[in-house]
Structure formats: structure tokens, C-alpha cells
Amino acid sequence: RGEISFEDCIAHQFRLIKASEYAILGEYDRFVSQRNGFGALVDFTVTRGIPLTIVSGGLAFIIKEFLDRNGWADLISLHVGKLELKEGRMAVIFPPLLERGSSCFKDDLVLRLKRQGKTVIYIGDGTYDFKAARASDLAFAVRGSKLARLCRRERVPFTEFQDFAEVVESIARSLG
């Protein structure tokens, strides 16, 4: 059908990067920012004993740097691709798909957690977050994002948000 998987798309993009991790981290402050209220989400999940996992196709070492700088590295787990430098270019190896019917590592994790009987809250913004959001128990989409448009079009229940404090309030109401 002329389609490529999420993992293949990201892997191709990473192969185009010729800079080292060191060079990329040197530009960290110019390009990395956090959405308002993320610290409140971390505090809320820690206080309530809710595991928090970042599931991302982004550069793992940048996510780790973000967590380290904010003192969250030990509080948040990662489900991301592993980066390797091959012939001066970045290569990414994503977690293997283990669940029947999964389309990418994002919904694969949600399906696995659901099979284990866990309640899954999913927060996303992109096209490749859709199947994971649809499979979750409670879905959140960044206001105006591709994920919000897809959920609306496909009538998948979700809550739109701009600030993570809104997510915290909604989860707190859901949990009672």
C-alpha cells in the first residue's frame, strides 16, 4: 500500500543525522522545552504510586538528559528506541513487537499492559499515538494535535489538553 511503519520512518530520519550525541546535546537548551505542568504530572503519579513511562520515537539520550536535568530519571521509565552510532550515522533499534495485532511499539506496550490487567492512561499528540490511545483506558491528546483530530474523527473517547495540569485534574477526577 505504499506505507512504512512508524519504526521504519523514524529509523530513516535518524540515519540522516550526522551529528554526534555530544553535538546534539550542545544544542539542547535551544531546542528542548517542556509542556507546562509536566512536573505536576510527575509529582501526581509519584504521590499516587502510578507508574509513569515515556513512550517516544524521539532521541532517547535527549529524553534522558531532560529527565536528568529535572531530577526525574529515577521516577520515569522509558520505552524508546535504542540508538547506536554506525558508520558515523545514527541507527535506532526499537523494542520488538510482542503483542498480536500491534502496529508499532507504542500500541504494543499498551496492549501488553492491558493483557496484564493494568489500567492504561495514554497521553499523546501524533498520528502514531492513535492506536495506543484507542487501546488505552483513558486517552489524552494535545489540543489541536493530529491525535486529537484522529480521535475526534474516529469517535475515540479522549480528553484534549494544553497543560499537563489539566491532565492531572482529569485523572484525579477519574480516580475519585
Where are these regions (language model features)?
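Alpha-helical substrate-recognition element adjacent to the catalytic core
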Residues: 1-75, 79-82
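Acidic, Mg2+-coordinating phosphoryl-transfer loop and its flanking beta/alpha structural elements
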Residues: 56, 118-154
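Histidine/lysine/aspartate-rich catalytic loop segments that bind and position anionic ligands
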Residues: 72-100
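Short, charged, surface-exposed secondary-structure boundary motifs
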Residues: 85-92, 149-157, 168-173
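Conserved Lys-Pro-Asp/Glu-containing loop-to-beta segment of HAD-superfamily phosphomonoesterases
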Residues: 101-128
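Short acidic-hydrophobic, aromatic-tinged amphipathic segments that line or gate anion-handling sites
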Residues: 140-142, 158-163
